[in-house]
């Protein structure tokens, strides 16, 4: 599930949102109210239950072959997402929806590389929310390795010390 050209996505477990209103997210460092969304490149980071802690790593322009092989695995693609085993059932049973939003009111947020798209005005979806479906299949179809671990922290420590690009979401929930 990725946005079409001219769109961004907002993922939610709530299928009844008719209007997105800017707010200060409880988990953000930013104090300005925003409507939050993601572009096509960041969409896979949200193919999870909302509260699920996840560590994600992918090959970037400065990634060494040694780090890629050590963390992602030789011949295992360019990207890996990892969660703890305790979250597998939720990943398999969550009903996740994607809202398609017009790209125009949104701007990239984050330095040096944007990690989200934000709008400072209310935004109405372009249509009804779409069920994302089987999140394991989403990962497989995108060629993203999904790794299950007993403890996410050792993996995360290796990722952030490597030359891979990375993102960690909801890690405070561990």
Identify the residue ranges that each predicted region occupies:
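Short, flexible loop/turn elements at secondary-structure junctions
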Residues: 13-15, 37, 103
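Adenosine ribonucleotide-centric catalytic and binding domains
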Residues: 30-35, 54-56
């Amino acid at each position: 599930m990725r946005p079409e050209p001219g769109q961004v996505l907002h993922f939610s477990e709530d299928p009844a949102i008719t209007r997105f209103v800017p707010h200060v997210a409880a988990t953000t460092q930013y104090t300005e109210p925003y409507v939050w969304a993601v572009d096509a490149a960041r969409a896979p980071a949200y193919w999870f239950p909302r509260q699920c802690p996840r560590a994600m790593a992918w090959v970037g322009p400065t990634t060494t072959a040694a780090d890629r092989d050590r963390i992602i695995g030789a011949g295992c693609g360019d990207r890996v997402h990892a969660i703890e085993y305790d979250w597998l059932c939720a990943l398999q049973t969550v009903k996740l929806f994607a809202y398609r939003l017009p790209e125009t009111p949104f701007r990239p947020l984050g330095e040096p590389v944007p990690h989200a798209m934000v709008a400072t005005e209310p935004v109405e979806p372009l249509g009804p929310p779409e069920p994302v479906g089987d999140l394991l299949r989403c990962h497989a179809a995108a060629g993203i390795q999904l790794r299950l671990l007993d403890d996410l922290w050792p993996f995360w420590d290796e990722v952030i010390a490597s030359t891979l690009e990375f993102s960690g979401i909801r890690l405070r929930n561990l």
